[in-house]
Amino acid sequence: MYGETANKLVQNAKRTQALPHLPPYASDLSRTIVREVRDLDRDVSAILAPYGSSFNPSADPSTACALLVNHLCMRRNKRCLLAYHKVRTEKLEGYCWEGIDILEQTGSGKEGEGGMAGKKEESSLSPEEEEYVRQYSDLLAAYKGQWTDIDLTGSLEPPRDLFIDVRVLKDAGEIQTEYGSITLTKNSQFYVRHGDVERLIAQGYLQRLS
């Protein structure tokens, strides 16, 4: 039934809004909807073919009704596709502003572990979304570069504690802080200034200890 697949895609988008992470791209649903639109467009062309450019809706209301239904189905499918991609785009842009490397977290371009050597982990992003994130991140970096003294992607709320205890969840190498350099190795703990590690916490490298 026309519109049923598009409805599933909208439900997927609604669930995505409530999730803290981005689920895998619904490539099968998207392709099915695109094929449906093309089928409808072919039906419209086939219906209008005998009339040429002289179709009069008032003279043939049944044909006009069929054309209207097909047209509305195509429009609805398009709107559902746009809504789905808008939800995912807004989430991706939000990750960029929060300093979260979504490409790394989704395993894009990385080899799997545990007997999966030589195979790449499946990314939750489509190839187009991965390219969008790269270009958006480049634009954001260029925009932030104009104000080097201000972290435009930082939290708008001041930290409650100036210094915090953190545990390293994964190796992050050496970082420079206001009080010198520290090497972040997995499972190590540090008492550091909140502002120096805020971005690393958001990226999942560190865990704040209560």
From Swiss-Prot:
GO terms for biological process: DNA strand elongation involved in mitotic DNA replication. Coiled coil: none annotated. Residues 108-129 are annotated as: Disordered. CDD domains: GINS_A_psf1, GINS_B_Psf1. Pfam families: PSF1_C, Sld5. Keywords: DNA replication, Nucleus. Residues 110-123 have a biased composition (Basic and acidic residues). InterPro entries: GINS_A, GINS_bundle-like_dom_sf, GINS_Psf1, PSF1_C. It comes from the Eukaryota. SUPFAM superfamilies: GINS helical bundle-like. It is found in: Nucleus. GO terms for cellular component: GINS complex. Component of the GINS complex which is a heterotetramer of SLD5, PSF1, PSF2 and PSF3. Belongs to the GINS1/PSF1 family. The GINS complex plays an essential role in the initiation of DNA replication. This is DNA replication complex GINS protein PSF1. It comes from Phaeosphaeria nodorum (strain SN15 / ATCC MYA-4574 / FGSC 10173).
